[in-house]
Amino acid sequence: MKTIVINASPRKRWNTAQILKSAYEGAKSVGADVEYIDLYDIDLKGCMSCLVCKSKKTEKVKCYWRDDLSPIIERILEADILLVGSPIYFGKPTSHFRALMERLIFCILSYDDYGSYYKGKLNVGLFYTMNAPEDVYNEVYEEDLKENENLFNLLNANVITYPVFNTLQVKDYSKYHMSAFNEEDKKEFNKNQFPKDLEEAFRIGAKLSKKIK
């Protein structure tokens, strides 16, 4: 099984990256061939509306824009599992997450019947890390983020969403203008909860990457 893990956070060692590295190890634990990509390292744009993927003269299930993201999309569509993680900024995943989703999903979407040109099956794990507590996610973010899950359903397999709540933004809040947050409470919460989130990310990575016999 081929698993591609994509970090759509600009931070390579903080919450989202740690969650994804745990999912990566979970995938490896069941024998998957795993590739890890930091999305902020590559030159990319969102969908440029060139519509070449919708032309009657071109091959379907392919993004034709010439930048570093197109070959990654090609590898994703040849893989078996996609694990993507993003922090939540102003209630939404990052712009890089959005760019990936736009171009990956648009190039497989049929404008004849709104079905999917993609005939394979790609399991998807979506990991969102956020400063917000669980009640805010439930009341404000969850319904909106569910739309992303609906789009990834066009890849014809399982889609699992895992939110990580009340994360630490920095190690030492006293160095920043962040007095709205209770550092002691956040650190205590993360001390107890974040290891559980890492374990769950490992489990999801393994579950989605496990070869069905």
Language-model region placement:
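N-terminal beta1-alpha1-beta2 submodule of the flavodoxin-like/Rossmannoid cofactor-binding fold
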Residues: 1-113, 171, 180-213
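Structural signal for conserved beta-strand scaffold positions within catalytic alpha/beta enzyme cores
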Residues: 36-38, 65, 126, 161-164
